[in-house]
A protein has these predicted regions:
Chain A
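Thiamine diphosphate
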Residues: 1-179
């Protein structure tokens, strides 16, 4: 497939969110999500709420569902650890929950501080009863996010999609001087 | 600073008086949950039994989803202290239909009345906190309509602020420490959610 003409996977995620009638999108910003966040901000049908910490997003999603709206939480793997106790709310209330997580601390990571939570992310999610979907190929992003949204909003599950670092690309700050 | 005089239960009963289908209520875990339940359990109450730090965010998500309804969050000082950032998040959205009432007894009331951060400083070995002012914090987070209620004469304005004033509204209410009966709503979270949605949306 020609990368120049094929749709960008970040644009495809936005389409999937629209298809599934997502009305509220919460985020602690991440470079891997920035293009998607901007799409959502420009949209007239999606309310974008920046968070101070990721756990706010779980409670917001519960409130949105109580009010009849679907939502999605965008975060980085480092934020998953902040949500653990609040993630229990998805089980206690049994409401559909969708989160899209950009991974750090794995493929080609340069920052040692990202590894502990990055490596712990799938285990933590599984421990809290969240279904974990994973994607590392651009061509499979759309189908994976769509399947996750179906499991969440049709199947009533709590679902996380891990957008692997191999997909996002190695973060590189270019030439740096170490002191 | 004057001592608190207000009792939480009669106060919450006044705030919720004549609640109709246009009032959606979320209460934080522990005392606030028992308070709204004593005032009268109803499907459009969402009393939390856990999820400390959740009520303000949950109220925001609900307020954004239901702009034509009034959303009232009632919670305690320690619950809010766990999620101070949620006040700034509320301020980014400026929901006109959201009111937050914090019942501040300056204690972790459910666990033995340990001093919370809103207790005064230098208040003895077991009752000292930071003197943290949640109303000032709310103001600093970007919520313009903020007030502190200490006296019975201020209660009518408090009820108005909670029920009808254009939001986002934040009121800190200093309440006395009391030993009160537990008045419990249903505990099952899925049931509480389903009955709330059934009453609001006509489907679980």
């Amino acid at each position: 497939m020609n990368a120049e003409t094929s749709a960008d996977w970040r644009d495809e995620i936005f389409e999937v969110l629209q298809t599934h009638d997502i009305k509220q999108v919460y985020h602690v910003p991440d470079a891997g999500h920035s293009r998607l966040i901007e799409h959502c901000q420009r949209s007239n049908s999606i309310r974008v709420v920046p968070l101070t910490t990721e756990e706010e997003g779980i409670a917001l999603a519960a409130g949105a569902w109580l009010g009849g709206q679907r939502s999605a939480l965008l975060m980085q793997s480092s934020g998953v650890g902040n949500t653990i106790n609040m993630m229990g709310l998805t089980k206690t209330l049994r409401f559909p929950f969708l989160t899209l997580i950009t991974m750090r601390g794995e493929w080609g990571e340069f920052n040692s501080w990202q590894f502990p939570m990055g490596q712990g992310t799938p285990k933590v999610l599984e421990a809290m009863g969240v279904l974990v979907y994973s994607v590392d190929k651009a061509s499979e992003v759309k189908a994976t996010v769509d399947a996750a949204a179906r499991a969440a909003f049709n199947g009533g599950q709590s679902v996380a999609v891990l957008l692997r670092q191999k997909l996002i690309g190695i973060k590189d700050f270019g030439k740096k001087t170490s002191k | 600073m004057s001592k608190a005089t207000l009792q939480r239960r009669p106060l919450v009963k006044k705030i919720l008086g004549g609640a109709d289908d246009d009032l959606l209520v979320i209460a934080g875990l522990g005392s606030s949950n028992w308070d709204i339940t004593e005032a009268g359990d109803r499907p459009l109450n969402m009393p939390l039994w856990g999820a400390m730090g959740a009520p303000v965010s949950m109220g925001l998500g609900l307020a954004l989803a239901q702009p034509a309804k009034r959303v009232l969050v009632i919670t305690g000082d320690a619950d809010l202290m766990m999620s101070l950032g949620s006040l700034a998040t509320v301020a980014t959205q400026q929901p006109e239909n959201l009111a937050i009432v914090v019942l501040d007894n300056e204690k972790f009331g459910e666990t033995g009345n340990q001093a919370s951060h809103t207790s005064p400083r230098n208040n003895g070995p077991t009752d000292s906190g930071a003197g943290a002012d949640l109303a000032m914090i709310a103001k600093g987070c970007g919520i313009a309509d903020v007030g502190t209620v200490r006296d019975a004469s201020e209660v009518p304005e408090l009820v108005k602020a909670a029920r009808t004033t254009k939001g986002p509204v934040f009121r800190l209410v200093k309440v006395i420490v009391e030993k009160l009966e537990f008045v419990m709503p249903p505990q099952d979270g899925a049931h509480l959610k389903d009955r709330f949605r059934q009453a609001l949306l006509g489907r679980p």
